[in-house]
Amino acid sequence: MKADGVFAGGGVKGLAFAGALESTAKAGYDEWGKLAGTSAGAITAMALAVGYDAAGMKEVFETLDLDAIADYGPLGEVEIPVNLAEDHGMTRGQALLEWIEKLLASAPAPAETFGELEARFGPERLQVVGTDLAHTRMVVFPRDVHLYVDEHGHRLDPGEFRIADAVRISAGFPYFFPPRSLRDAETGKDGVLVDGGVVSAYPVFLFDTAEPRHPTWGYRLYSGNPPEKPPYTEIDGIAWPVDMLKAIVDTSMNAFDKFATLAFGPRTISIPTGDVESLDFSLSQEQKDELFDFGRDAAAGFFAGEPTGVNTFGAIPTAVSAAGSPGN
């Protein structure tokens, strides 16, 4: 059977997607149409888009050398202050880009640009979410590439944009990886492009239409309470300024996506990730295996319930309207 897939962000916790995809294939969904993702989810969506299957996905994540991705420089973590001052990131970000490029080049259906990918699989095969901090907007690659220009002032061609560059932007966790720059066509100023999770860690709505041809399954990672339970952050005591700042950041990044998870619950596979942190680059093999098992078990339980892929097109606008203040 065929389905579209959308994968949320989660840093190194994205290893759980490999297990979830194994159970998805066992449920009969072994062909993908359109794919989208943010951050770690962008890497997963990209790999599926260029032909890696469920078994291949496990190998993909096993090739990810987490220590190498944290490329501080020849002197290691001593170089962090210099990296931050010069490039606004703790690491150089080059190792992650090169790993992505290698995945694309060695894929069953290798592709360098979005145009090459769509020529083989059709339009909207892959959508990758990034954030332009300077212009305060979500950027969906390749759809929004035309918003930017090259050094000669010519608008960028979505079909010629490199997949690896888009995924590197989407996975560029702020401060840890340096942001990327693209010149905005309207303002003439450089955009500051970072992790798509800043605006939407779970863009499950990207492929929604009034009459979908097949279901869109969403894959979302969570730690702590399940997403259907209300979260709570204690903001009190001597550390309240830090607690409040963290709560502001978490709310700005996740409030809409938590709402979307409820709106799109019938087609969301929620995967617990235990106590693993998004930027924990020192995972043991036991932790990696545990993440895989979390994903496999969560997806197996989801499909055991015989989900129908309920079409929730328009659910968010309707719910937002209903939740408005009286008279709106």
Regions found by a protein language model. Give the residues of each.
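Patatin-like phospholipase
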Residues: 1-38, 46-328
